[in-house]
């Protein structure tokens, strides 16, 4: 009861083709591929930014320890 037969998949395919047409489906797939590509590019850009974080120390360590011990 929970599995789909070949007839179910054929009906779904016919409905999708009727709704979108033959020309629209490749266009939708191309747009989805572009979206995935941009998402991956964004993820790698963020990872590269995280690697290049600048570590600055404006205050000497001793002063920071004193401030931390006072709080």
Curated annotation (Swiss-Prot):
GO cellular component, as recorded: TAT protein transport complex
Matching Gene3D superfamilies: 1.20.5.3310
GO biological process, one term: protein transport by the Tat complex
Signal peptide interval: none
Basic and acidic residues bias (residue ranges): 49-71
Keyword Cell inner membrane: yes
Single GO MF annotation: protein transmembrane transporter activity
Transmembrane segments: 1-21
InterPro entries, per database record: TatA/B/E, TatA/E
Membrane topology classification: Single-pass membrane protein
Keyword Transport among UniProt keywords: yes
Primary location group: membrane
Localization per Swiss-Prot or TrEMBL: Cell inner membrane
Keywords: Cell inner membrane, Cell membrane, Membrane, Protein transport, Translocation, Transmembrane, Transmembrane helix, Transport
Residue ranges of the region described as Disordered: 47-71
Pfam family, one: TatA_B_E
Subunit (UniProt): The Tat system comprises two distinct complexes: a TatABC complex, containing multiple copies of TatA, TatB and TatC subunits, and a separate TatA complex, containing only TatA subunits. Substrates initially bind to the TatABC complex, which probably triggers association of the separate TatA complex to form the active translocon.
Function, in words: Part of the twin-arginine translocation (Tat) system that transports large folded proteins containing a characteristic twin-arginine motif in their signal peptide across membranes. TatA could form the protein-conducting channel of the Tat system.
Membership in a protein family: Belongs to the TatA/E family.
Protein name: Sec-independent protein translocase protein TatA
Originating organism: Chelativorans sp. (strain BNC1)
Lineage, opening ranks: Bacteria, Pseudomonadati, Pseudomonadota, Alphaproteobacteria, Hyphomicrobiales
Gene field: tatA
């Amino acid at each position: 009861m929970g599995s789909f037969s070949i007839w179910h998949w054929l009906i779904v395919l016919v409905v999708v083709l009727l709704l979108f047409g033959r020309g629209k489906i490749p266009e939708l797939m191309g747009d989805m591929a572009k979206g995935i590509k941009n998402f991956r590019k964004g993820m790698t850009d963020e990872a590269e930014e995280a690697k290049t974080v600048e570590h600055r120390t404006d205050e000497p360590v001793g002063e920071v320890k004193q401030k931390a011990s006072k709080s």
